[in-house]
């Protein structure tokens, strides 16, 4: 499969998608969002892939949306076409998806990272939602996912003042899971992804669904969902293999069955 705006690589059970619009600092346009989804479609269908990674360059994960593409849009056009509906599909993926953010993760780039299940970032990372300076608001989940990640006060401040959040603060407030040097970021992210991919994909997907459910329902309903998922894994061969391997003190070999 050939792409114009991304690179796709598969290794050790991990699918790596690298944004590749260097002259535009990986600014998100319709073509890029479309190709990300095509790559994710391919990775989700590939039974050898157990985890996916979304990365950019050292200078920029993605510095925002492509303003030249958006400047001439009209309300009837974007409303009737459901503009950004393709972006929503990124957050709806079932396999685990990790963002590796180095440099700028601004505007749509910040929102793209927030669509992933968790974020690893480099020590030079900068996150922000500066849409208000353009006379608009975040449009692919920024007001919602950022608030869930860092709380109302910081989300309000970042969106209303366009302040950029650096790596250390991002980790402290829960926006990112871990920080690495920019030289080590991709290697460390791939190691984590390979570790996830080596486990039962069925169980990984159920964990992802269960944690996401915590943001959608009350505690009682979330607990019921988790309990049903827990019961369900006992219908899999991976559960039998995992527990038998533990008893026998050996490495488990999961087959996603």
Regions inferred by a protein language model and the residue ranges of each:
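Conserved CoA-thioester-binding segment of acyl-CoA-metabolizing enzymes
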Residues: 1-57, 88
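Terminal peptide-recognition signature
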Residues: 17, 21, 36, 54, ...
